[in-house]
């Protein structure tokens, strides 16, 4: 009994590293008022990797810049990082607290006339640290990001992925507790993106970093984040555990985001442009099936064929893993007796498989 109480206490006590309360950001451009961020409140736990996603113009980059006050929120908005209310600090105190927050960007922002190690040394230059200790620190960081062999190279001699590794090492120079990543993989190819994701995972685990990831790339969110907030038109329309958000989206933008990044979204393209390829006959039904958890691995299609005597042709399929939980779907053509097809689709609905009829002949 005592053990259960202790476990409950541990689970309930989760330290909040970043607390955003009623954050708004308004711009005036050519007499037009633009609400880039609209009354957003988010809590990000210590040591977690939190994603903020949305389509272009959703306000996610503006929001993340409010965390370290590169953008000041409108009056009434409060930003607290590691227990310190940044929005209440004077400029000197804010500069000191910003050393707890590292940041990387899409375009690296390296100094081209300085070597790799000189770029990493730059944040340490005016911190009263002995030169020898600075070099030791920078060398250790470059080893951590797997760039020990590139210390004396210039940025022009590096690939995009290597440049981002230098930027990460530089962002970690002052031992921050938080790392903000603003579209950090958007300029990289898929393989390099994967490598940067794996590096961020390693840093999160090794350094106990709290990482905030701003992205429009679904694969980055799926592979990296434990929780996510979805933004549209400056608002957070949905947030929670990544599996819960994407397996059962509550907002239209989350559904559109998933469709835009899923292989199953090609079904609409097939219908509009290549209907002859589908070769739908009289009575056929084209349907999209979405399922989660154990349903992904169950023989759903073969069971339907056997039970209802309908022919099912799989046109598209997609399966993803969200923190070890499978989520997926298929686009299929159902052929056979009309009543049998209706019964087959109805049985799927009873088994918690979402059915969306896309076309029927």
Enumerate the predicted regions with their spans.
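A short, surface-exposed alpha-helical micro-motif characterized by mixed small hydrophobic
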Residues: 221-223
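Short coil-to-helix segment of the ABC ATPase nucleotide-binding domain corresponding to the Q-loop/switch region
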Residues: 114-121
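ABC ATPase "signature
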Residues: 239-240, 248
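ABC ATPase NBD coupling module
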Residues: 86-102, 126, 132, 245-249
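Conserved ABC ATPase "signature" region
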Residues: 84-85, 121, 125, 132-149
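Conserved signature/switch motifs of ABC ATPase nucleotide-binding domains
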Residues: 153-156, 174, 181
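Conserved ABC transporter NBD signature motif
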Residues: 76-85
């Amino acid at each position: 009994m005592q053990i259960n109480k202790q476990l409950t206490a541990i689970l309930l006590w989760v330290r909040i590293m970043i607390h955003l309360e009623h954050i708004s950001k308004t711009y005036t451009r050519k007499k037009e008022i633009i609400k880039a961020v609209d009354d957003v409140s988010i809590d990000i736990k210590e040591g977690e990797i939190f994603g903020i996603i949305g389509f272009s113009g959703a306000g996610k980059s503006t929001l993340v810049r409010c965390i370290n006050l590169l953008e000041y929120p409108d009056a009434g908005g409060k930003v607290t990082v590691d227990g310190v209310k940044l929005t209440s600090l004077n400029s000197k105190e804010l500069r000191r607290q910003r050393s707890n927050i590292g940041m990387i960007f899409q375009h690296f922002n390296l100094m081209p006339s300085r070597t790799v190690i000189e770029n990493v040394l730059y944040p340490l230059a005016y911190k009263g640290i002995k030169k020898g200790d600075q070099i030791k620190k920078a060398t250790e960081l470059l080893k951590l990001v797997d760039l020990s062999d590139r210390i004396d190279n210039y940025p022009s001699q590096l690939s995009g992925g290597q440049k981002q590794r230098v930027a990460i090492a530089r962002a970690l120079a002052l031992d921050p507790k938080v790392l903000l990543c603003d579209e950090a993989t958007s300029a990289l190819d898929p393989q390099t993106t994967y490598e940067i994701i794996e590096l961020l995972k390693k840093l999160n685990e090794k350094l106990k970093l709290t990482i905030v990831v701003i992205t429009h790339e679904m694969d980055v969110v799926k592979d990296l984040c434990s929780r996510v907030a979805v933004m549209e038109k400056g608002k957070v329309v949905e947030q929670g555990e990544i599996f819960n958000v994407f397996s059962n989206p509550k907002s239209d933008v989350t559904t559109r985001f998933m469709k835009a990044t899923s292989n199953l979204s090609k079904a609409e393209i097939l219908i509009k442009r290549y209907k002859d390829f589908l070769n739908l006959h009289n009575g056929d039904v084209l349907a999209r099936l979405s399922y989660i958890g154990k349903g992904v691995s169950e023989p759903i299609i073969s069971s339907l064929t056997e039970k209802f005597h309908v022919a099912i042709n799989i046109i598209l399929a997609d399966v993803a893993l969200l923190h070890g939980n499978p989520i997926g779907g298929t686009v299929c053509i159902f052929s056979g007796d009309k009543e049998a097809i209706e019964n087959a689709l109805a049985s799927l609905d009873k088994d918690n498989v979402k059915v969306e009829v896309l076309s029927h002949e």
